[in-house]
Every structure is written in structure tokens, then in C-alpha cells.
Amino acid sequence: MQIAMVGLGRMGANMVRRLIKAGHECVVYDVSAENVAALEKEGAIGAGSMAEMIGKLEAPRAVWLMLPAAITGKIAREVAGHLQPGDTIIDLSLI
């Protein structure tokens, strides 16, 4: 399965590692380019923007959010603006 992860803090990064270990293809995005680069070294596909991340996914797309509460709504709306019917947002942000 191909899945995107937005938010590569401790929880998001560890989830990406588990998904990769289980054989999933992960496309990752974070405001910290360092966090993206670290996971690229572990097998993830990095993206420098939300649009680039979505563009690297095949339909139907699945985007997982692992974000702090303060920005969850804003980022969820931004992601939704790039998606089509049939795509999925998985929100496990801290609220």
C-alpha cells in the first residue's frame, strides 16, 4: 500500500518506520526538511511541499496526518484541497 504521512515528529516518524518495515511505500512531508531527509535515508519518498507529496501518490490516495492540535485544521483543509473523491485522510493528530 502507498500512503503519505504529514507530520514527522516522534510519532509520525516512528509510524513511517513501521509502515516501511511492513512493506508499505511512504511519501513524507514535514515543515522540517531535516525530518524529511532523515526518513528518505530510511527508505521513504520525500516531498518538499504538500502539492509535491500528493503528486507522488497514485489514486486512490491515502494521506495520514500526525500533527499538533494547533495546526491540524489548517493542514487538513490544505490536504483536502489537493484530493479527489475516493481519496482518504487519516487524522491521528494530537487534539
Predicted regions span which residues?
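Beta-loop-alpha module in the N-terminal Rossmann-like domain of NAD(P)-dependent dehydrogenases
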Residues: 66-79, 93-95
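NAD(P)+-binding Rossmann beta1-loop-alpha1 motif at the extreme N-terminus of oxidoreductases
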Residues: 1-62, 82-88, 92-93
